């Protein structure tokens, strides 16, 4: 559930792991990130899609059967939230089990989110706000590493001659 949520919202792992249930606005498909949990110490709002909403609703039903923790992703024994290092270790373990490259990290989900948003036509200003960057320049430096294949696909849907 955390993996899906990070991929669909662009949140950092630390932001996602510290979420409280009250940070969610399921009906509006949004999450209000508290300033103390963001890298830049500035509150922001992120969003998620319909599929993620359905998964989150099921997760909440499951979670509530096992713990009364206020955290969205609690550790059952303590009621605290899952620690970043524990999630990273499990993430790496599951990559290995699936035969995937262990070089992937949870932050790759954020990178993938940003790249897919750009490839799907989102403007860089909106993306920068969603990612919580202090400026568009930060977003450009971090996420504009498109491959030739990426550029080719984008070009084909925007070719000036194709639309004459």
Model-identified regions with their sequence ranges:
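Catalytic tyrosine of NAD(P)H-dependent dehydrogenase/reductases that use a Tyr as the general acid/base
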Residues: 103-107
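Conserved tyrosine-mediated DNA breakage-rejoining catalytic core shared by Y-recombinases
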Residues: 9, 14, 18-58
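Key DNA-contacting residues within the recognition helix of helix-turn-helix
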Residues: 17, 88, 139-140
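Short, polar N-cap/turn motifs at the start of nucleic acid-interacting alpha helices
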Residues: 24-26, 101-102, 122-141
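Catalytic-site neighborhood detector that most strongly recognizes the C-terminal catalytic loop/helix
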Residues: 37, 131-156
């Amino acid at each position: 559930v955390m993996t899906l949520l990070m991929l669909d919202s662009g949140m950092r792992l630390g932001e996602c792991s510290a979420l409280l249930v009250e940070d969610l606005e399921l009906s509006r498909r949004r999450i209000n990130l508290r300033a103390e949990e963001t890298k830049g110490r500035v509150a922001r709002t992120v969003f998620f899609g319909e599929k993620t909403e359905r998964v989150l609703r099921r997760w909440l039903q499951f979670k509530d059967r096992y713990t009364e923790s206020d955290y969205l992703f609690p550790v059952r024994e303590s009621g605290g939230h899952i620690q970043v290092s524990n999630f990273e270790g499990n993430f790496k373990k599951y990559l290995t089990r699936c035969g995937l490259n262990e070089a992937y990290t949870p932050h790759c989900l954020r990178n993938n989110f940003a790249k897919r948003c750009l490839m799907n036509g989102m403007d860089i200003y909106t993306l920068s706000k969603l990612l919580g960057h202090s400026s568009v320049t930060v977003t450009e430096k971090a996420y504009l590493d498109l491959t030739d294949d990426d550029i080719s696909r984008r070009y084909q849907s925007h070719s000036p001659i194709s639309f004459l």
